Amino acid sequence: MVQMMRRATIADVAGAAGVSKTAVSFAFNRPDRLAPETASRIRTVAETLGYRPHPVARMLTQGRTRTIGILTPQALSVIFENPYFGAFNAGVATAAEASGYALHFISPLHGSLARAVNRATVDGVVAVGLSAHHAEVEQISVAGLPMVLVDSTALPSQAAIEVDDEGGARLAAEHLLSLGHRRFVVLAIEPSDRSDGDDPDGVPARRLRGYRAALDAAGIDLPREGVLTSVSTIPGGAAAFAETWDAGQRPTAVLAMSDAIAVGALRAARERGLAVPGDLSVVGFDDVELARIADPALTTIHQPIARKGEQAVELLLAILEGRSGPDQHEVLATRLVVRASTGPAPDAARRTH
């Protein structure tokens, strides 16, 4: 019978290197407590013996889990369905892996986000789409965990990463106005129970302000019935556009607060025999891969989603390591990307659908 090779222990390394077990521990966890040449020699001996420090032991020694929590108000099944979060999480993962950190997604546990937060063992948190006044955010602050808010309303004392939502929305509306459109519908992001959707400074509110600012400047009123909410998915966008069109509204332009909603509107328009952009123009927001492969390719507002995820993690690590204060606030630029889903407003003869 083949006998399994015994795993090297900290005592084996200490004996081979001629040092104490404490010195071996310092070499991996507190190298500043040893002379550089001693720490290097111990690590070389450990590598030769195939010794690896136990991760739990390292956590206890360092007081760190080397894990970052990603706090989201929606269930993971919803998060992973949304292409925006795919791009954002890719950026988060890139920055975390580069610094040797793991990720822990914190989403509602048995319907309770507070319970999930309470059970999370992490060094710091990136909170997405939650305002500073939400109970879970306050819970993290009280616990003293470093935190970066993303796409959220932050207090002056809190670190935050966001994009210029209002400016981007204004660009979208101005683009359609320049093409002669005068009849608009806005397909807004529907808030979850815990998101910042009802926050007057949350992402949906900022984007709506941007749309309204451009329309107001052009003398165009956007009535209450001209704003419908939708889950940020393709089916959600399709249902929202179908509702407005089937109710008798006849917009020539759709301002959608996400690319997924916009692509849903394209689908519903096609099902109703509308040509895009001949009869209807559609602008999204995000510029995810879905926008580029849509038919027709989607005009949208680009935001650096992956980079936003990277910067959120980089800022959190800087706070953890004392290289940045906890109150840094960064706003990333947005820009218009014109593709095939927008065109001149149809003339009066064609506005008879």
Residue ranges and their predicted role:
Residues Q74-A87, I106-L113, I161-L171, L187-A240, ...:
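Hinge/beta->alpha junction and helix N-cap segments in small-molecule ligand-binding domains
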Residues M1-A8, P55, T67-E174, S178, ...:
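Alpha-helical recognition/docking segments in bacterial nutrient-uptake
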Residues A238-H353:
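Flexible loop/turn connectors
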Residues M1-T67, A348-H353:
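N-terminal helix-turn-helix DNA-binding module of bacterial transcription factors
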Residues A23, Q62-S77, G124, H175, ...:
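Short beta-strand segments enriched in small/hydrophobic residues
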